[in-house]
Structure formats: structure tokens, C-alpha cells
Amino acid sequence: MSEALLEVQPDLHLVLRCHPGQLEFAGNYLRRFLARVELTPFVSQFQIAFDEANWCIDNALTRQSVLRWIAELSQTAVGEQARLPAGIRAVISDIVPEAFAVAKQAGLPGIGVSNYTWYEVAAGFCGPGEIEPLRTMYEQADLLLNYELSTGAAIPIRSKIPAGLICRPFNDSRIAEIRIRYKQPERPLIFLSVGGALSLERIGLCEDFDYLYTRGINPPAGIT
């Protein structure tokens, strides 16, 4: 989305806040536009605790983490408000709630881009009253560009526009280069990529295929 906005709006400048681990990728991906992009780190404190021994979510620890995160949201929003540069015309978030409180306080449009919010996730661990501050923060958003396969009516953002399926443009020459370098005769080549991290160590992948995967994915033993 950032790339598309920069393509169609040659006078547009973006302040892009993302996890420190994504800054290098964002800089490389948007390198054609770096004169108009400011990259700064932001870490959301929402954490799902994982019990690696039993290969499941630790519900009790996750609940504690969610409640602690919600208790700190207002203060986090105050800090983000102080960092808001002059001249900003809109705040777009995927899909941290603090962004909408900041936009509301500044009198700016607050736009979400996602197919869920952390409110629905938190509802799986906490009661409605406990996560009401989270609902209230999301309700300050003006609009959600709602991807396919969304959590629908459970999303506490009132105004939604269906956004359909979205992907980056295909680079046919780059795909051809990858096939020449990695594709083996009679063996399908599968590309795996996620927005964050994903462990596949206990999930069976067909050994008759070859896999390319992005940083953050841990493949099963025997898959390189």
C-alpha cells in the first residue's frame, strides 16, 4: 500500500513506523522513494505467550500479557502523539489501536487496513469489560479498509469498505531469475512468506517439493 500511494502521489511524504526487525526490509522495498519516506521504529507490546513444550498457546500468560498491554495503551498513545510530525494529513494503521487515538486527538483521519483487530484476538483471553478500553480505542477510527476473510461484524470499527485481496505487483523477470537459480526438474518450487514469524518445525511439509522461505520462518528438520 505504501508503494502504491507513493507511485500515484508524487508529492506525498510518508512517515512509516514499524517493528525494528522490518525496517531493513521496508527500506529495501521502498528504496526508490527513500527521499520521501521517513522510517522509524515502533514496537507493539501485544504478545501471545507460546508453550513450546506442548506446542500450544499459554492462555494464562497470554491473558496477563494482554491485560498489561491494554493498561499501557493510553500512555503509549500519549507518547505517539508527542512524536507526531507536523504536516501529517492522515494516520493509517495495520492495525495498532494507539494510532486511532492519536489521529482523533490531532483531528486527523484515522484509517485502518486489515482483516481483523487485536480486539477480537484479546476477546479470546479476556472478558468484555476487561477489553472495553481496547474497543473504545478502535471505535475512534474513521474507516477500515477491510481485507477478505475478515472477522466481520466483530471488528469494532463502525465504517468499513471492502478492500478485496491485495498483493504486490509481480516482477516476471525476477520470477524467471528465481526459477533459473532454484527450480529443479520435476520438483515443484513453493514460496513461503508471512508478515511476521512462523515456526513450521512440527508441521509436515512434503519432501517432494523444494521451498523458498523468508526470514522469520523456521522450517521442519530436513527442509533447507
Kindly label every feature range from the protein language model:
Residues 2-3, 168, 174-224:
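Donor-nucleotide binding loops and adjacent catalytic segments primarily
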Residues 89-90, 143, 189:
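Structural motif
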Residues 13-21, 144-147, 211-216:
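Short internal beta-strands
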Residues 109-170:
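Active-site-proximal region of nucleotide-activated glycan assembly enzymes
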Residues 6-70:
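Conserved nucleotide-sugar phosphate-binding/catalytic loop shared by glycosyltransferases and other
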Residues 52-90, 97:
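Conserved nucleotide-sugar donor-binding subdomain of glycosyltransferases
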